[in-house]
Amino acid sequence: MDFKQHIAIVPDYPKEGIVFKDITPLMNNGKAYKAATDEIVAYAKERNIDLVVGPEARGFIIGCPVSYALEVGFAPVRKLGKLPREIIKVDYGKEYGKDVLTIHKDAIKPGQRVLITDDLLATGGTIEATIQLVEELGGIVAGIAFLVELTYLEGREKLEGYDVLVLEKY
């Protein structure tokens, strides 16, 4: 399926000079959303995934239906102050600035094969931080899946050595 026809291009959002790729039209179209999910599920099955991990918030939108289809758990990666129990955290840079990501300390068992999902690969900061959290807890990053990659931001360079699936590139 041509997923680009279901991704809206929004200039100057969230600030001037940024060209935002909006995946909500894809989510609004049941067939497109299912097709995207099915491609990621097929990719995950080849990697014997034990757990899906996704950074907030759009990583949840991609990861939860994938974890449901695989019948494995989903572990959310959240911003500081959003998880109620004991956490580990990492500072990171992203396309629009700096932030902190966290995960529950008991979310991943050592040796679990993890699929990381997110909507977009831009500079790679969010995914690099998510990888750090997964690996600090002893998880094995068995794959990383994105709907969209902004190739001109060269985030893929931060993912060298990891297996990556991207459904559409800009």
From Swiss-Prot:
Copy the pathway line from the protein's UniProt record. Purine metabolism; AMP biosynthesis via salvage pathway; AMP from adenine: step 1/1
> Could you tell me which InterPro entries the record lists for this protein?
Ade_phspho_trans, PRibTrfase_dom, PRTase-like
Q: Chief subcellular site?
A: cytoplasm
* GO CC terms in record: cytoplasm
Q: Which domain of life is it from?
A: Bacteria
BP-aspect Gene Ontology terms: adenine salvage; AMP salvage; purine ribonucleoside salvage
**Which Pfam family would be a valid example here?**
Pribosyltran
Record key words, sorted: Cytoplasm, Glycosyltransferase, Purine salvage, Transferase
What subcellular compartments does it reside in?
Answer: Cytoplasm
Q: Which reaction does it catalyse?
A: AMP + diphosphate = 5-phospho-alpha-D-ribose 1-diphosphate + adenine
Known EC number: 2.4.2.7
The reply on keyword Phosphoprotein is no
Instruction: Write out the function statement from the record.
Output: Catalyzes a salvage reaction resulting in the formation of AMP, that is energically less costly than de novo synthesis.
Subunit comment for this entry? Homodimer.
Database matches in HAMAP family: Aden_phosphoribosyltr
Q: Which protein family is it in? A: Belongs to the purine/pyrimidine phosphoribosyltransferase family.
Please state what the protein is called. Adenine phosphoribosyltransferase
